[in-house]
Amino acid sequence: MSYLFSSESVSEGHPDKVADQISDALLDQFLAYDPAAHCAIETFNTTGQVVIMGEVRSSQYIDLQTIARKTINKIGYTKSEYQFDGNSCGILTAIHEQSDDINRGVSREDDDNQGAGDQGMMFGYAVNETENYMPVTLDLAHLIMYTLAQIRKEGKVMTYLRPDAKSQVTVEYSDDGVPQRIDTIVVSTQHDDFIQPKDGSDEAQKEADEAMLAKIKADVINILIPRVKAQLGDKVLALFNDHINYLVNPTGKFVIGGPHGDTGLTGRKIIVDTYGGRGAHGGGAFSGKDPSKVDRSAAYMTRYIAKNMVAAGVSDEMLVQLAYAIGEAKPVSVYVNTYGKSHVNMSDGEIARHIEAMFDLRPRAIERQLKLRQPMYLETAAYGHMGRKNEVVEKTFTSRYHETKRMRVELFTWEKLDQVDRIKKEFGL
């Protein structure tokens, strides 16, 4: 018997993602001028208001308000009619210094033995159903949102689009976990009130709302989806069919949105950020945290390990868990689940022991392996932290306190497949 599985994504204009992007933009600014900075920055946004809170230990000052406003404007909140825009919103900052107690637990004379910034468990996952070893449901949901944002920013078609949006993709799987077809695609997008009623009656308003909805649904099917499909390989493209159930703005009108429609908070989209409900999640959010926080760095490391293991052919699917105690450098446990899809004559426990022997899993070693002290985090804060393109980009940082810095930054280092040959040798593949 087949089954259905769904994953969702949200746009960069979703209130929670606005918060994530502000937190990570501030983190990047600190790391650009002070790579050793320790940060835990939380952002809250609502109608006309942003609150930036958290703990920082750094030798440098940065202009929090300027960076926050720039980030909001870049997302697309630039009009007063949105009831939230980067130029006029109020910004309250409440940043204070990191606790000495936490700093003592993390800092060591020997940097290699830097302790974990907190206790907790972190998971990494990979599956071979897409080219980037991600669940196809989440990969498509992200691509729909990213493509919709590109259409909005180009401003040539679907010119009524506003920044807030969500998507959800449901795929039918066979009993053995192979994707068969796309069953349902949900797209909810904020929009201008672009068709006005002919008079003040309720009937005229209903007629105008229905006309807007019909236009948006037609554009999603005839403009957005073809652009999404044009970016796909044959394997995923084959999942599209003539019987997909398209649910576009199912509640009807979606004019009020963004932080005016819902409050946003850093760290509230952790399943969107990771694997769309597949694998597992330890509960720790990423954005605003420097890599001494294993919530972030160890989650990236487990993804790196799982992806390279699946790419090497150890298993068709793999979940890796690391768990840490605050102040301790080495993980207290390493766990592997291959879901019965392993191609090596080993138990999952034996595979875990090989991983522990192959990879240095101390926090400072993870930072070095994945080059996590770079200002590389704003790009992670929308459309997923996993399954993204590893590339080197030029970034420019300006500050009224410091000289302008131009840097080459390597993004999504945990997506590299540079351990495949080593893993094949280790496992005799």
Q: Residue ranges of each PLM-predicted region?
A:
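N-terminal, positively charged regions that mediate nucleic acid binding
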Residues: 1-40, 45, 420, 426-429
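Conserved phosphate/anionic-ligand binding catalytic regions in large, soluble enzymes, centered on
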Residues: 8-10, 14-19, 115-130, 255-280, ...
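Internal helix-turn-beta structural module
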Residues: 46, 315-317, 324-429
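Alpha-helical support elements that line or immediately flank enzyme active sites
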Residues: 12-31, 126-150, 289-313
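Short glycine-rich or small-residue beta-strand-to-loop segments that form or flank ligand, phosphate
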Residues: 4-11, 49-57, 92, 122, ...
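C-terminal catalytic subdomain
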Residues: 270, 275-321, 330-337
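Short, charge-patterned binding micro-sites
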Residues: 40-58, 326-330
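Glycine-rich, mobile lid/loop segments that gate access to catalytic sites or pores
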Residues: 6, 66, 73-77, 81-256, ...
